[in-house]
């Protein structure tokens, strides 16, 4: 299990990356070393991994510049994305409020359009990915794959402290964002308005979990976790011990699906 990583810690690992189409992005690393950070640090490129790649958490925050577009593409690792601020479009769908997107490996998605505000979103993976494979240039590499494409969007409910959010919760309110599937894929928002223990799915029911604090604060394994803090839990580890602070917390759990031969 990784340690809790705060937003402030991640900002110390912030690097600029200009996409091939000229879109400016800024990448803040939370967990692991992603391909942008490797380039920024002058590290050698990594070889491709067979699929599924070995379990290796890679998590970072993307700030996409105003009035920009990231073209359609796919990755070679399973991932979640959490849109947390800004406006634009994901494909043809408006980015409205907090949104979770999941895309399994080799599933093309996007484009991501940012309007004049720009957009911010977390990218969370459980394995190494060498970088985007742009479409349609890399369409040929998808031929012959028998696995069906798999991705989707889930809206995150209003949070504690928001105008439409819960004002008093007895115990813990669990709200489904991505319905649970047989292989363990799921995402659930847990909210409290006071001190309370929070229990999520058993880690070995999937292939790794991320927990992201969206509002308030809590203790995760006796480590302080404030807004925009996160932690990764491996499937062979015990469930994290989470206790909401006295003002409550809104914390999002995202679990990756199991994979054959992993």
Located regions from the model:
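Structural motif
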Residues: 99, 228-229
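A short, N-terminal "cap"/entry segment at the start of jelly-roll beta-barrel domains
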Residues: 1-54, 132-186
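Short histidine-centered beta-strand/loop micro-motifs
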Residues: 50-52, 69-75, 91-93, 112-114, ...
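The feature marks the first
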Residues: 47-89, 93-98
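Ligand-binding loop in jelly-roll beta-barrel domains
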Residues: 94-95, 105-134, 183, 224-226, ...
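Glycine- and acidic-residue-biased ligand/ion/polar-headgroup-sensing regions
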Residues: 65, 75-90, 200-221
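Short, flexible domain-boundary/linker segments around small modular repeats
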Residues: 53-66, 182-197
